[in-house]
């Protein structure tokens, strides 16, 4: 087995270092897994990860968000809780963000070059601002809105 020293491998190493330096396990683990996959026999599975990775990630994220409700750590509010302005605002924001993310997916497919910018912005946000890497979908939706694609 020989190492493939290319631009992508270098980027993954830089991300790995940034993840360690910024104490961000999400970036560190993601970059390490992808670097290992790229440099080994697992590279044949990268297209599968590319095709289903976001969907699987969203499923896992949704399970993580819903699990406190299922475990009983978070209780459903009574009817008056649903009628408060904070609940109405939170539902509205949830709808807006989901709609924006849905509009971002087609933009990412139509103009894949923009994905690079979105990823760089997401990496900066995760590595240095304590963000979470669900940003590309929402960022693409906001970008689609700004570009007049919506």
From Swiss-Prot:
Annotated compartments = Cell membrane
User: One Gene Ontology cellular component annotation?
Assistant: plasma membrane
Q: Which residues cross the membrane?
A: 1-21, 52-72, 81-101, 123-143
Topological type in the membrane: Multi-pass membrane protein
Q: Which Pfam families match?
A: DUF441
Q: What is its main location?
A: membrane
Q: Which positions carry the signal peptide feature in this UniProt record?
A: none
Source organism superkingdom: Bacteria
UniProt entry keywords in alphabetical sequence: Cell membrane, Membrane, Transmembrane, Transmembrane helix
Q: Which cysteines are joined by disulfide bonds?
A: none
InterPro entries to which the protein is assigned, alphabetical: UPF0756_TM (IPR007382)
Similarity remark? Belongs to the UPF0756 family.
Q: Report the HAMAP family cross-referenced here.
A: UPF0756
Question: Under which name does UniProt file this protein?
Answer: UPF0756 membrane protein HI_1074
The species this protein was found in: Haemophilus influenzae (strain ATCC 51907 / DSM 11121 / KW20 / Rd)
């Amino acid at each position: 087995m020989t190492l493939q020293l290319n631009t992508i491998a270098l980027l993954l190493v830089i991300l790995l270092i940034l993840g360690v330096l910024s104490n961000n396990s999400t970036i560190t683990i993601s970059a390490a897994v992808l670097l290992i996959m790229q440099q080994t026999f697992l590279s044949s599975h990268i297209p599968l990860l590319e095709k289903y990775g976001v969907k699987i990630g969203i499923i896992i994220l949704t399970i993580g968000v819903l699990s406190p409700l299922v475990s009983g750590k978070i209780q459903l509010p009574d009817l008056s809780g649903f009628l408060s302005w904070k609940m109405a605002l939170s539902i509205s924001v949830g709808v807006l963000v989901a709609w924006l993310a849905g509009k971002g997916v087609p933009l990412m497919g139509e103009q894949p070059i923009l994905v690079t910018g979105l990823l760089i912005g997401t990496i900066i946000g995760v590595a240095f601002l304590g963000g979470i890497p669900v940003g590309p979908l929402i960022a693409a939706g906001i970008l689609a809105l700004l570009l007049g694609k919506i």
